[in-house]
Amino acid sequence: MEQTLSIIKPDSVGKAHIGEIVAIFEKSGFRIAAMKMVHLSVKEAEGFYAVHKSRPFFQELVDFMISGPVVVMVLEGDNAVVRNREIMGATNPQEAAQGTIRAQFGESIGINAVHGSDSLENAAIEINYFFSKIEIVNSAK
């Protein structure tokens, strides 16, 4: 079983889409191994997105991610990283396939409803950024 990180971003939290998005993940076969709501500080958002620090959109991304609470989850399932990215859809909601989370709930390339890890390596780093081992309930093996 793989694990991946998913974040329901401030736009979706603010519009009360948490339950709908969680239901999509569960109906897609994911098990939620951990979940919590947090309101990121500037330092926390900058740390999480440090890989993008030199990109022109960095400050806008940080400002958006601190604009309201987010829901952070560890999703568990077979081929979790790839499946989560398929369920989320393209970064730009206008290019996302019909039925994906971003097509349903995203507004723009910057305000796009959810974040998901892009590799197993990054998933491990991102999960450790938000959760301690005691907070993650692994499936019985």
Curated annotation (Swiss-Prot):
ATP binds at residues 9, 57, 85, 91, 102, 112. The gene is ndk. Major role in the synthesis of nucleoside triphosphates other than ATP. The ATP gamma phosphate is transferred to the NDP beta phosphate via a ping-pong mechanism, using a phosphorylated active-site intermediate. GO terms for biological process: CTP biosynthetic process; GTP biosynthetic process; UTP biosynthetic process. Belongs to the NDK family. The active site is at residue 115. Its EC number is 2.7.4.6. One of its GO terms (cellular component) is cytoplasm. It is found in: Cytoplasm. Homotetramer. CDD domains: NDPk_I. Its main location: cytoplasm. Keywords: ATP-binding, Cytoplasm, Kinase, Magnesium, Metal-binding, Nucleotide metabolism, Nucleotide-binding, Phosphoprotein, Transferase. GO terms for molecular function: ATP binding; metal ion binding; nucleoside diphosphate kinase activity. It comes from Chlamydia caviae (strain ATCC VR-813 / DSM 19441 / 03DC25 / GPIC). InterPro entries: NDK-like_dom, NDK-like_dom_sf, Nucleoside_diP_kinase, Nucleoside_diP_kinase_AS. Coiled coil: none annotated. This is Nucleoside diphosphate kinase. It is an enzyme of class 2 (transferase). Its cofactor is Mg(2+). Pfam families: NDK. It catalyses: a 2'-deoxyribonucleoside 5'-diphosphate + ATP = a 2'-deoxyribonucleoside 5'-triphosphate + ADP; a ribonucleoside 5'-diphosphate + ATP = a ribonucleoside 5'-triphosphate + ADP. Gene3D superfamilies: Nucleoside diphosphate kinase-like domain.
